[in-house]
Amino acid sequence: MKLVLAIVLILMLLSLSTGAEMSDNHASRSATALTDRLLGPKASICRGTGGRCTKDKHCCGWLCCGGPSVGCATSFAPCN
């Protein structure tokens, strides 16, 4: 019984230390991402459904550009 309790205690301590490490890594990644965003080249912002576009790359995700009058729209066929 003492062996089982010791193993459970060790596993709990390992999970706590791993969780703290993951939180630290997340904070580090967030700070790095913010720095890159502020100091890096201007990021292009994609446009949602109906957003103005001239090329497919201006639209978010699976949206395709239907031209300036249509904007970004969903399409059943792949974008050109």
From Swiss-Prot:
- Domain comment quoted from the record: The cysteine framework is XI (C-C-CC-CC-C-C).
Supply the name of the protein: Conotoxin Pu11.1
Q: In which tissues is it expressed?
A: Expressed by the venom duct.
Keywords (alphabetical) are: Disulfide bond, Secreted, Signal, Toxin
List GO molecular-function terms, semicolon-separated: ion channel inhibitor activity; toxin activity
Q: Record's family? A: Belongs to the conotoxin I3 superfamily.
Q: Which domain of life is it from?
A: Eukaryota
Proregion span(s) = 20-42
Q: InterPro entries attached here?
A: Conotoxin (IPR004214)
Spell out the subcellular localization from the entry.
Secreted
Q: Which N-terminal residues, if any, form the signal peptide?
A: 1-19
The Gene Ontology CC terms held by the record are: extracellular region
Disulfide bond entries: C46-C60, C53-C65, C59-C72, C64-C79
> Chaperone among the record's keywords?
no
